[in-house]
């Protein structure tokens, strides 16, 4: 401000009859500027404190959250075949064979049921709130090794069904059986351990690429992680990274493309070697070339596994054993691709572009 007065050749300033020299005005303006700056900084600090308190409330709310209720008593164990009786029994080491350890409370007998990935949903009703039901009489049957696809508009209930399979929510009515066992009897951690999940929104953690793949199975060796990456089609781009599998990932893998992040997620599921897979829109947000790479890896991963697929691109579900069409929580059509095309109904309209999934 004083520079402006000097440039204009104004040696003094008159305010309300008082004459002030530049020597007085300039320091006053500078001090006012500094004072206002400090006030601005204080307001910013207050905003930071308020945001911190709000975050602290959420943190303490999470800390105080009660543990998830779990009444399950059927557990997943390593199994082996007894050479004398040819019956399954529990093993104290990794055998590559899994079984459900099912104690029968009435008799005290322990039954070992092979983990196969056989799933039955029988007339299931569900609502996120008691007064708003989102699934109505849903029945789904998946034999071991089958690929079952769910299609429908956003909000039809596709993801809700997969959440019920994982028991993130409990059903209001009906039955869900996994390998013939009511899922309510299976311990939740063991149930989820038997399921491989690949989501559209990938979460990568700060650490190496190898560590992020190993999250699927913390006991996996480096060789097993690399084999899983090759199966997923991720090995090619990983080996081109600056440090290969030892490349550090930060910021949820910000240095990788969406397709590359998804390939790592698929490798993470592959290293767990689950008998059942849930693919929730796994290839709906990547380019066509990357989708082809991902799909090739997924086809290998799905061999011999029960797979539930939710995709917005019908090309990814065309080879499914069963396609289930949902509308407002109800199954309106089911069958394979050729059967549904022949019906010329809802799926036919989707496939020919008459309807949109979004």
Where are these regions (language model features)?
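Solvent-exposed, non-transmembrane helices and loops of integral membrane proteins
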Residues: 68-80
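Helix-loop-helix
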Residues: 1-57, 62-63, 88-97, 101
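Proline-centered turn/helix-capping motifs that create local helix->coil transitions or kinks
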Residues: 64-71, 236-240
């Amino acid at each position: 401000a004083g520079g402006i007065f000097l440039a204009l050749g104004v040696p003094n300033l008159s305010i309300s009859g008082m004459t002030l020299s530049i020597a007085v005005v300039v320091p006053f303006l500078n001090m006012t500027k500094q004072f206002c700056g400090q006030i601005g900084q204080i307001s910013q600090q207050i905003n930071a404190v308020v945001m911190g308190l709000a975050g602290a409330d959420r943190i303490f709310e999470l800390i105080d959250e009660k543990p998830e209720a779990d009444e399950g008593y059927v557990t997943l164990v390593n199994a082996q075949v007894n050479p004398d009786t040819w019956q399954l029994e529990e093993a104290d080491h990794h055998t590559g064979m899994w079984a459900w350890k099912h104690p029968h409370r009435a008799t005290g007998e322990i039954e070992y049921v092979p983990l196969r990935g056989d799933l039955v949903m029988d007339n299931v009703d569900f609502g996120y709130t008691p007064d708003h039901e989102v699934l109505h009489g849903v029945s789904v049957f998946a034999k071991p090794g089958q690929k079952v696809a769910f299609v429908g508009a956003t909000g039809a209930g596709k993801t809700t069904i997969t959440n019920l399979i994982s028991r993130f929510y409990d059903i209001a009515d009906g039955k869900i059986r996994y390998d013939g066992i009511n899922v309510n009897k299976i311990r939740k951690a063991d149930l989820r351990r038997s399921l491989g999940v690949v989501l559209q929104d990938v979460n990568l953690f700060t650490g190496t690429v190898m560590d992020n793949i190993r999250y699927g199975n913390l006991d996996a060796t480096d060789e097993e992680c690399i084999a899983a990456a090759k199966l997923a089609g991720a090995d090619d781009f990983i080996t081109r990274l600056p440090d290969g599998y030892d490349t550090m990932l930060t910021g949820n893998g910000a240095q990788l493309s969406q397709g590359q992040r998804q390939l790592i997620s698929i490798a993470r599921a592959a290293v767990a070697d689950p008998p059942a897979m849930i693919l929730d829109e796994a290839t709906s947000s990547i380019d066509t070339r990357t989708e082809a790479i991902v799909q090739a890896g997924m086809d290998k991963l799905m061999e011999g596994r029960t797979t539930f697929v939710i995709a917005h691109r019908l090309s990814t579900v065309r080879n499914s054993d069963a396609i289930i069409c949902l509308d407002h929580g109800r199954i309106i059509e089911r069958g394979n691709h050729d059967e549904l095309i022949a019906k010329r109904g809802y799926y036919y309209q989707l496939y020919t572009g008459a309807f949109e999934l979004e």
